[in-house]
């Protein structure tokens, strides 16, 4: 194997006037595990496409080591539309599957027609299959399909959703075992156990990995290096995500006051990383006792500075925020919520977790009055002012620009109880300069999510309901949103799959714990996500607490 699996020398890449890479020189070690981070639009996906040979730099050299293989998971991966799920996954095994089929064919022929030629061919095939560790190929295939929750093997891929197609493509790619594995948001559309399996599989993967992801626990558990892309430059940091936070904070301190806000946010996130589980729980409980203090402090400081996301202070909350009492709610004859009771604390941040389709959004719609309970009650306090925008982003004119959607064409807008420059407000959500002039109809998933956030937080409520706000956000925006919530004097309820976000911000967890006996069962817990997971094991035992999916096994024999 060459010293480097991939090399870039003085690479420049631009899309029109936007420079993605500016005179970048990098070399990647064989077997290195690298997480790629940076703001949306920094060119993370473009770098993967160049390394996969799907795109070329404008200047400079970029090349794979001689004889090495490369594979990529794209955000919208191509599949063979004429084949089933299994047919596509088997393509990842390449000629190994052909050789295994031929070995079995030769074995059958030799039962009736033993010849030296067949014996020689069988010996050669056996040696190649031994080297490729291919004897349990079917078991490897079924294990990977199960671990990644692929659709049924005989399902035509033309029937699959976007998330299902990504799982099939990831499964196919992992089975192909390239020397350089390029992954663009690999944890998107995976459930918690599939993510855990993938982390363990990649941590022991013999080849090099470059993964673009906003999943910070994934970056902590898998990455040995972090490559940050920012304004055309590439900054490599040795270590995982926690180490990256520390080293970047040091770099910003050297750069001086220009990035003071960013440095402050990184320092606060780093302090959380360094604190133990008990300290995190203590801080979470302290927040619940500090509502009056935080509200008074926020009222004194009316000025909003939108270099980062900020949540405007809403009216003072009374003692009753939302009280849910023995709530039952179903849809199309299926029970989604059964006998659910909880009371929102007025300075609480509640994480709502569970797979897609179990009723999380239905719960939100019931709280805001868009759905009515089948039985039980939902009482919203008299002092509550809700901030909520439907996940479907209804009412956004696709022809309007991002700035027009948020500002209605006004230079100054009302954000909560304060008037602010509209372009500065929109800029805080990652829409800088010309990005504010993009028509809403052409936005990516992450951009639509940031626009939805801007519309929700602009309302100035004291109870904020956020439906999947962390989807498709870069780590910078995620950190900014976390800090904004932690500094917000009010109550927030957030549907999210982001484990880091749930751990860092939440005072409570509302978790779907449905099973065969009761698919509409929910559990209310005081504490963050990590504490909830420990509690679940204590209550239900290790086996019962784990989702009923395969535990990690390597895709090799031995």
Swiss-Prot record:
Listed Gene3D superfamilies: P-loop containing nucleotide triphosphate hydrolases
Matching InterPro entries: AAA+_ATPase (IPR003593), ABC_tran_Xtn (IPR032781), ABC_transporter-like_ATP-bd (IPR003439), ABC_transporter-like_CS (IPR017871), EttA (IPR022374), P-loop_NTPase (IPR027417)
Binding site for ATP 1: 38-45
Annotated region described as PtIM, given as residue ranges: 239-320
Protein name: Energy-dependent translational throttle protein EttA
Main location: cytoplasm
Assembly notes: Monomer. Probably contacts ribosomal proteins L1, L5, L33 and S7, the 16S and 23S rRNA and the P-site containing tRNA(fMet).
Record region (Arm): 94-136
Reactions catalysed: ATP + H2O = ADP + phosphate + H(+)
Sequence similarity: Belongs to the ABC transporter superfamily. ABCF family. Translational throttle EttA subfamily.
GO biological process: negative regulation of translational elongation; translation
Recorded domain comment: The arm domain is inserted in the first ABC transporter domain. Probably contacts ribosomal protein L1. The P-site tRNA interaction motif (PtIM domain) probably interacts with the P-site tRNA(fMet) as well as the 23S rRNA.
Organism: Mycobacterium tuberculosis (strain ATCC 25618 / H37Rv)
């Amino acid at each position: 194997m060459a010293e480097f699996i991939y090399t870039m020398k003085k690479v420049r890449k631009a899309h029109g006037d936007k420079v993605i890479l500016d005179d970048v020189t990098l070399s990647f070690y064989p077997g290195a595990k690298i997480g790629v981070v940076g703001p949306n639009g920094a060119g993370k996906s473009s770098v993967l496409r160049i390394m996969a040979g799907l795109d070329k730099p404008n200047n400079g050299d970029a090349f794979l080591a001689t004889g090495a293989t490369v594979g990529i998971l794209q955000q919208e991966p191509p599949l063979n539309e004429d084949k089933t799920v299994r047919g596509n996954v088997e393509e990842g095994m390449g000629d190994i599957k052909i050789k295994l089929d031929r070995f079995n064919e030769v074995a059958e022929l030799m039962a009736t027609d033993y010849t030296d030629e067949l014996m020689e061919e069988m010996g050669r095939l056996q040696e190649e299959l031994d080297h490729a560790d291919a004897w349990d190929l079917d078991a490897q295939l079924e294990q990977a399909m199960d671990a990644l929750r692929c659709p049924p093997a005989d399902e035509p891929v033309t029937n699959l959703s976007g998330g299902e197609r990504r799982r099939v493509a990831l499964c196919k790619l992992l089975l192909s075992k390239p020397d350089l594995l390029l992954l663009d948001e690999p944890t998107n559309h995976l459930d918690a156990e599939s993510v855990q399996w993938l982390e363990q599989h990649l941590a022991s993967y013999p080849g090099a990995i470059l993964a673009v992801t906003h999943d910070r626990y994934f970056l902590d558990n898998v990455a040995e290096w972090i490559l940050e892309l920012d304004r055309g430059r590439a900054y490599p940091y040795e270590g995982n995500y926690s180490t990256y936070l520390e080293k970047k904070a040091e770099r910003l301190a050297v750069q001086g006051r220009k990035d003071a806000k960013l440095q402050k946010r990184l320092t606060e996130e780093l302090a959380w990383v360094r604190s133990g589980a008990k300290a995190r729980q203590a801080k979470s409980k302290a927040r619940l006792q500090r509502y009056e203090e935080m509200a008074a402090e926020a009222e004194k400081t009316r000025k909003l500075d939108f270099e980062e996301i900020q949540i405007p202070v809403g009216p003072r909350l009374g003692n009753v925020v939302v009280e849910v009492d023995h709530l039952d709610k179903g849809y199309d004859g299926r029970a989604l919520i059964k006998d659910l009771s909880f009371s929102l604390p007025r300075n609480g941040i509640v994480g709502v977790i569970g797979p897609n389709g179990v009723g999380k959004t239905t719960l939100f719609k019931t709280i805001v009055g868009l759905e009515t309970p089948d039985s039980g009650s939902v009482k919203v306090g008299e002092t509550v002012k809700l901030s909520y925008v439907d996940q479907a982003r209804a009412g956004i004119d696709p022809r309007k620009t991002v700035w027009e959607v948020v500002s209605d064409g006004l230079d100054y807008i009302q954000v909560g109880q304060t008037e602010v420059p509209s372009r500065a407000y929109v800029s805080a959500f990652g829409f800088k300069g010309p990005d504010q002039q993009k028509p809403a109809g052409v936005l990516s998933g992450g951009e639509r999510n940031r626009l939805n956030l801007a519309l929700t937080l602009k309302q100035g409520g004291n109870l904020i309901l956020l439906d999947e706000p962390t989807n498709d956000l870069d780590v910078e925006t995620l950190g900014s949103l976390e800090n904004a919530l932690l500094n917000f004097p009010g109550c927030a309820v957030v549907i999210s799959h982001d484990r880091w976000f749930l751990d860092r911000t939440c005072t409570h967890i509302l978790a779907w714990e449905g099973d065969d006996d009761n698919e509409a069962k929910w559990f209310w817990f005081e504490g963050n996500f990590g504490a909830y997971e420990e509690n679940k094991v204590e209550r239900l035992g290790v086996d019962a607490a784990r989702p009923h999916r395969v535990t990690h096994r390597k895709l090799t024999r031995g």
